From Swiss-Prot:
Protein name: Mitochondrial thiamine pyrophosphate carrier 1
Tree of life domain: Eukaryota
Membrane topology, as annotated: Multi-pass membrane protein
Cellular component annotations (GO), alphabetically ordered: mitochondrial inner membrane
GO biological process, one term: transmembrane transport
Solcar repeat coordinates: 12-111, 122-208, 215-310
Length: 322
């Protein structure tokens, strides 16, 4: 945790928050990229490995079961690089998202403090509002990159898109501007409570855990892991719905899963999944998602705190040298 700072949101300038957030996002994304590909493949799988009746219309689609077997199968059939499919738009998304998220979080919190003055909101409420606002703004601003990441990760041996440039051109021509925002409603519906719960939990744990003298400055990382697990489990169905909506359109039957159903809107998608796959269908990929989110949040928050601390020390040294 950075020195002499009571709250994450009070630390550093807007530029410092943006640099630290972007750096944290870049590093975290590369570390968890293979787990992200596995999660997306499992989320898009509408058939069950344990239900033969759901496998009647596979159309050549693979049957994935579990994190490790899925990693092995992707590696065997598509090669090592396949575990980083969609990493270019994902890196761009994570860097942009993290920078916007931390900057907005700080700005909203300071705005709330100015608005309420001496009658400041409780810390948990303040963190929830700032976190939810930051999540909504960052999600909307970077959503086209999120959609591209999903579509690239969903590609099997057959390549639907050959490059980032071609994917943007093809979607713009065949689906129009709205094609880049398919599933945005589910994305915002997911991220607002997620970020609110995440930051409120993180802020409530960060200072108490900071007094435990954990090795390697791991208190920030541990708080990030716990906050991420709690938040991710609560909103996971919306994340799955978002992924299935993102691969709708003229290329729907060309991804690794050839039998992805036609979905229209968040609630119709949820009803369809519940009717055909049951409640478990809404939680496909949850385990790997938690495995992914925990290290991602730990790396993100640990890196953010370290980079911000370095920037603050550098700024202080510059002031002293004048």
């Amino acid at each position: 945790m950075s020195e002499s700072a009571e709250h994450l949101k009070d630390e550093g300038s807007k530029t410092q928050s943006m640099i630290a957030g972007a750096t944290a996002g870049l590093i975290a994304r590369f570390v968890i990229a293979p787990l992200d590909v596995v999660k997306i493949r499992l989320q898009l799988q509408s058939h069950s490995a344990s239900d033969p009746l759901s496998q009647r219309d596979l159309r050549g689609s693979p049957i994935y079961k579990g994190t490790i077997p899925t990693i092995k199968r992707i590696f065997r059939e598509e090669g090592l690089a396949a575990l980083w499919k969609g990493n270019v738009p994902a890196e761009l998304m994570y860097v942009s998202y993290s920078a916007i998220q931390f900057t907005t979080y700080r700005s909203v919190t300071l705005g709330l403090q100015d608005a309420f003055g001496e009658h400041r909101l409780p810390a948990a409420a303040e963190s929830f509002i700032a976190g939810a606002s930051a999540g909504a703004v960052a999600t909307t601003a970077t959503y086209p990159l999120d959609l591209l990441r999903t579509r690239f990760a969903a590609q099997g041996i057959e390549r639907v898109y050959t490059s980032l440039r071609s994917s943007i051109r093809d979607i713009a021509i065949s689906e129009g501007p709205r094609g880049f925002f398919q599933g945005l409603g589910a994305g915002v519906g997911q991220i607002v409570p997620y970020m609110g719960i995440f930051f409120a939990t993180y802020e409530s744990l960060r200072l108490p855990m900071g007094t435990l003298n954990m090795p390697f400055g791991s208190a920030d990382a541990s708080a990030g892991v716990i906050a991420s697990v709690i938040a991710k489990t609560g909103i996971f169905p919306f994340d799955l719905i978002r992924k299935r909506l993102q691969v709708q359109g003229p290329t729907r039957e060309r991804y690794v899963h050839k039998n992805i159903p036609v979905y229209n809107g968040v609630f119709q998608t949820m009803r369809h999944i519940l009717h055909n796959e049951g409640y478990r269908g809404l939680y496909r990929g949850l385990t790997v998602s938690l495995f992914k989110s925990a290290p991602a949040s730990a790396v993100t928050m640990w890196t953010y705190e370290r980079v911000l601390g370095i920037l603050l020390k550098w700024e202080k040294s510059q002031e002293l040298s004048k």
